[in-house]
């Protein structure tokens, strides 16, 4: 008989069909326009930057817990456990000492080469490892990324926190070596705290930047160790940039001195090594004759009578500048690809 004469209760099928018909896009209106009209957004859409940063901050406890758990589990299968966090840079320092200090005489112009070298190795290793793990973190955690919804920036930040926790453990050994080689404990050591915080900030930005690069180009992880090895040789880890041959232009020395890793290494040495501060160019009134002795013979104490190419204040400004610029650039670069992680 059809539907003629049949009563349909209010709110029944006919009303629902009418409501659907009313909500259908009008002629010429796209689904995107209709979604915008009702305030609908894709569930996987990239959030606004401020909202994204707020979400990252809200998950700070997850970042800390994840980093701590990973730090504890890293060496569970090794018999010496977390001692490898300290043994690795110490072994590297021993090798560099034999090659550069004994064979190549890179200790010329440096009063306390042991403390100078170990400080450089430990500080550079913090940045080096942060960049390496940053380049692989997204692919290494692809299952976690696909299973859970959270700001992806939490992962690179957690891995940098792992490296920072390892650095703090290494600092105990570094302090013992520095004090054991005759450096006194002074108030300058307090400058180590802002130095490490600036370096950690720089490392977070670098890790975020490399996380996006590594997520899109897996082969980059094979190239990164080589590039970092080259970078290490240009940072004054094993030698004094100020003691390089006089034939090297001043601008070239400034480029070496102002690269970020060299800046944080120099600031750390300035904080914990009294001999480094005493021998720094400009530490004493300028004396052309004594400066010439340093230029020829590389006598450490004579370096203090030379004009400084870079002052401590300039190093601090460079340290702050690198930290802020790289963090902002890393956050923006990583955030722009937030919805792409986990698709590969």
Describe each model-derived feature in a short phrase.
Residues 2-344:
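Hydrophobic transmembrane alpha-helices and immediately adjacent juxtamembrane helices
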């Amino acid at each position: 008989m059809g539907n003629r004469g049949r009563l349909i209760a209010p709110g029944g099928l006919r009303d629902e069909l009418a409501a659907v018909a009313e909500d259908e896009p009008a002629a010429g209106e796209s689904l995107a326009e209709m979604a915008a009209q009702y305030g609908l957004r894709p569930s996987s859409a990239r959030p606004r930057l401020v909202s994204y940063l707020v979400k990252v901050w809200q998950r700070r406890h997850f970042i800390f817990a994840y980093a701590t758990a990973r730090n504890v589990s890293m060496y569970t299968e090794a018999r010496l456990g977390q001692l490898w966090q300290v043994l690795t840079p110490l072994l590297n320092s021993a090798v560099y000492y034999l090659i550069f200090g004994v064979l190549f005489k890179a200790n010329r112009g440096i009063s306390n080469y042991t403390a100078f070298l170990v400080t450089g190795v430990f500080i550079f290793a913090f940045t080096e490892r942060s960049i390496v793990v940053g380049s692989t973190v997204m692919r290494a955690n692809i299952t976690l990324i696909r299973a859970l919804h959270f700001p992806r920036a939490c992962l690179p930040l957690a891995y940098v926190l792992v490296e920072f926790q390892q650095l703090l453990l290494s600092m105990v050994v570094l302090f013992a070596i520095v004090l054991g080689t005759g450096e006194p404990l002074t108030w300058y050591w307090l400058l180590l705290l802002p130095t490490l915080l600036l370096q950690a900030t720089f490392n977070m930005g670098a890790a975020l930047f490399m996380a996006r690069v590594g997520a899109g180009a897996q082969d980059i992880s094979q190239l990164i160790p080589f590039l970092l090895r080259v970078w290490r040789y240009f940072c004054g880890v094993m030698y004094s940039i100020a003691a390089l041959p006089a034939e090297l232009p001043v601008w070239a020395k400034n480029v070496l001195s102002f690269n970020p890793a060299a800046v944080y290494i120099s600031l750390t040495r300035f904080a914990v090594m009294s001999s480094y501060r005493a021998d720094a160019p400009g530490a004493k009134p300028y004396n052309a004759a004594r400066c010439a002795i340093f230029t020829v013979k590389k006598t450490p104490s004579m370096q203090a009578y030379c004009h400084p190419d870079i002052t401590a204040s300039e190093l601090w400004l460079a340290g702050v500048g690198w930290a802020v610029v790289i963090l902002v650039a890393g956050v923006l670069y990583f955030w722009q690809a937030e919805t792409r992680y986990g698709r590969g």
